[in-house]
Swiss-Prot record:
Gene Ontology biological process terms from the UniProt entry: translation
Subunit organization: Part of the 30S ribosomal subunit.
Primary residence: plastid
Organism of provenance: Capsella bursa-pastoris
Chain's role: Binds 16S rRNA, required for the assembly of 30S particles.
Protein name, entry field: Small ribosomal subunit protein uS14c
Entry superkingdom: Eukaryota
Location within or outside the cell: Plastid, Chloroplast
Matching SUPFAM superfamilies: Glucocorticoid receptor-like (DNA-binding domain) (SSF57716)
């Protein structure tokens, strides 16, 4: 189980990303449309004004049940070992074990 402080930190980052998403998107669109380099630098400064934690690259997917940040399966939102346990216990409908 991940520390609760790390899980709360991740939730805080998600809120910040959602809050500043439109500002970032509009600034990037302005940069792509303007041909002048000096104006691009001004807009680039505006793009750096939001907090660092509002950047989408700082977000991590976490396991829904344990909060583990690695080995997550997007389709289920679970880490690998929890996914395996749930499939073996038949708790995930439609998921089957592979054999070859």
């Amino acid at each position: 189980m991940a520390k609760k402080s790390l899980i709360y930190r991740e939730k805080k980052r998600q809120k910040l990303e959602k809050k500043y998403h439109l500002i970032r998107r509009s600034s990037k669109k302005e940069i792509s449309e303007i041909p002048s380099l000096s104006e691009k630098w001004k807009i680039h400064g505006k793009l750096q004004s939001p907090p660092r934690n509002s950047a989408p690259t700082r977000l991590h997917r976490r396991c829904f049940s344990t909060g583990r940040p690695r080995a997550n399966y997007r389709d289920f939102g679970l880490s690998g070992h929890i996914l395996r346990e749930m499939v073996q216990a038949c708790l995930l409908p439609g998921a089957t074990r592979s054999s070859w």
